[in-house]
């Protein structure tokens, strides 16, 4: 029974990057032996166990073969006679197919260290093409390691083109696709993810609305550079789409509600935001009301940030509309409802009076 660190922990240590999660591989053990040592089984599809003290995952060495369509169409075989090399060859990239034993010796049968040195994302074997999810994973790794100069190897990009052309990407569930997109959006260079998908034809299959949309990627690049949260990055990515296709994309990928909401509001209101100073007071107040700046001020602030990231992505050095919009929102929020209530107004009459007072406040702000 031999235990190895595998995958990302080995890769990131060799790159000098922080190691967060550690995956462990057990070679030469049976399920019964693992149970006898106190490991707790958690794997539904293949033998994975939790360490009795650390809670970290330990997987038995296994092989796999294609048995159906999509990322889930595999049959696994785990037994004590599966070797380290047989387990590592089923992995996606050479830089993820290294192992390290308890003495610190690195096992690298597929030359992952060479590809780390050459800054290449290269597939381990032709079996790479059997799992369509790997197209998204490789694009995500390209986004993560772009600051270090990594690129996708030509032969791997060609395999990704073949997968995209095969229709296998259509077998991915919305949940799996979104999980990869979500993680990619939060990488250092998220625009690279979509550039790689575009280069291999996968973007046309998964997000045809974004094909050749360089402005969207420029806005996303700015959002990442300014360390914006997920929903802001998503809205930046969809900034150039009309409301109808934004709804289509949101529904197709089952994006989280916060992402859907901000992206759709941006699609509906980006033009007004960009023309904020020219809007009449009534239109400016309608914009504030649409975002419910009184109860949900952060949502309007997020919208302003999306507008700003889009402007910076378009090459503008600043976005003066941002402070103008914030000032208008502050003026409308400053209106005190108490005098209206004390005057005996209720219901619809109160709402209409409050709106009139807010309009006066916005008009005064515009004159200031």
Swiss-Prot record:
The keyword Lyase does not apply. The keyword Metal-binding applies. It catalyses: a tRNA precursor + 2 CTP + ATP = a tRNA with a 3' CCA end + 3 diphosphate; a tRNA with a 3' CCA end + 2 CTP + ATP = a tRNA with a 3' CCACCA end + 3 diphosphate. ATP binds at residues 8, 11, 91, 137, 140. It comes from the Bacteria. It holds the Pfam family PolyA_pol_RNAbd. A single active site specifically recognizes both ATP and CTP and is responsible for their addition. This is CCA-adding enzyme. It comes from Pseudomonas putida (strain GB-1). The lineage of its organism: Bacteria, Pseudomonadati, Pseudomonadota, Gammaproteobacteria, Pseudomonadales.
